[in-house]
Regions:
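Acyl-donor (CoA/ACP) binding surface of acyl/acetyltransferases
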Residues: 1-33, 66-182
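Conserved GNAT-fold acetyl-CoA-binding loop/helix
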Residues: 33-54
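Short, surface-exposed helix-loop/turn micro-motifs enriched in polar/charged residues
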Residues: 40-41, 88, 186
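Short, conserved alpha-helical segments within structured domains
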Residues: 41-48, 92, 113, 137, ...
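A short helix-loop-beta-strand connector motif used in the catalytic cores of GNAT acetyltransferases and
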Residues: 53-64
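Hydrophobic scaffolds flanking metal-cofactor catalytic centers in soluble metalloenzymes
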Residues: 184-229
Length: 229
C-alpha cells in the first residue's frame, strides 16, 4: 500500500473519497457529457456511485477534487500503476487520469489538480515517468496535459480496457521526472553507479536543489567543475 496523502492547491483539496460524497459524485458523474469523455459510462443511480466509492475509488492513488469555495467534490483525479494501467507502461511509471463536473469546465481546475499530482508523484512517490491519454476528439483534456508539461507523443492507439470508447483512438502524452533524467545522464557520463551516489541523489527534490547538489557532488568526485547554471 502506498501512503495516502491529502494534497492542497490554491483552490482545491485532494483527499480520499468517502461514502458521504455519494450524492456529489452522482450529481456530476451522472452527466452524459462527463464520463464518456474519460472512457466510462454515466452513473445511473446513487447506489452505483456509492459502490464505486467503496470499490474502484477505495485505493491509495485516487482523490476527490474538493473545491474549497463550495466544500464538496466536483471531480476526481488519480494515477494507475503499470499493473492496472490502460496502456502498457514500465514498472516505475504511472498513468494519470482526471475529470471535473461540467459546471466547472474551463476554469483550470484539472490543470491545477494535475500539476499538484505531478509534483507528488515525482517528488514523494519517486515515479520516473507519467503517462496520460485522451480521446482524439477531446482537445480540452489534451490542453490540460500540455499545460502541465506533458509532451504529445504523436502516437494513437486503442484502449481495450475502457468501458466506453474502446474502439476509439486515444492520443498518448508523456512527462518524465527531470530529477531522474539528469541523475541517469550524470551517472552514465561519469561511469559511477554506487550506493553512495544513489543515496546522495535521492535527496534531491527540485530543480534548483538538483543543479546545486549535482555541481558540488560530481565536482568533488571527479575533481572537475560543473556549473550549476
Amino acid at each position: 500500500m502506498e501512503n495516502k496523502a491529502i494534497l492542497e492547491t490554491e483552490r482545491l483539496i485532494l483527499r480520499p473519497w468517502n461514502i458521504d460524497d455519494t450524492p456529489f459524485l452522482f450529481k456530476y458523474a451522472s452527466d452524459p457529457d462527463v464520463g464518456p469523455r474519460a472512457g466510462w459510462p454515466p452513473h445511473n443511480s446513487l447506489e452505483e456511485s456509492r459502490q464505486l466509492i467503496e470499490t474502484i475509488f477505495n485505493n491509495d492513488t485516487t482523490w476527490a477534487m474538493v473545491l474549497k469555495d463550495v466544500g464538496e467534490p466536483v471531480g476526481c483525479i488519480g494515477y494507475l500503476r503499470h499493473n492496472n494501467a490502460n496502456i502498457p507502461i514500465g514498472e516505475e511509471e504511472a498513468e494519470v487520469g482526471y475529470w471535473v463536473g461540467r459546471p466547472f469546465w474551463n476554469n483550470g481546475l484539472c490543470s491545477e489538480a494535475l500539476s499538484c499530482l505531478v509534483e507528488y508523484c515525482f517528488n514523494t512517490m519517486g515515479i520516473k515517468c507519467l503517462w496520460g491519454d485522451c480521446f482524439t476528439d477531446n482537445p480540452s483534456s489534451a490542453r490540460v496535459m500540455t499545460k502541465c508539461g506533458f509532451t504529445n507523443c504523436h502516437i494513437e492507439r486503442k484502449c481495450e480496457s475502457l468501458i466506453v470508447g474502446k474502439d476509439k483512438p486515444v492520443m498518448l502524452f508523456k512527462l518524465e521526472n527531470k530529477n531522474n533524467i539528469i541523475m541517469n545522464e550524470l551517472i552514465a557520463c561519469c561511469g559511477l553507479n554506487c550506493e553512495k551516489c544513489d543515496a546522495r541523489m535521492a535527496t534531491i527534490n527540485n530543480d534548483e536543489e538538483l543543479r546545486k547538489k549535482t555541481a558540488k557532488f560530481w565536482g568533488e568526485l571527479n575533481n572537475c567543475e560543473i556549473s550549476p547554471d
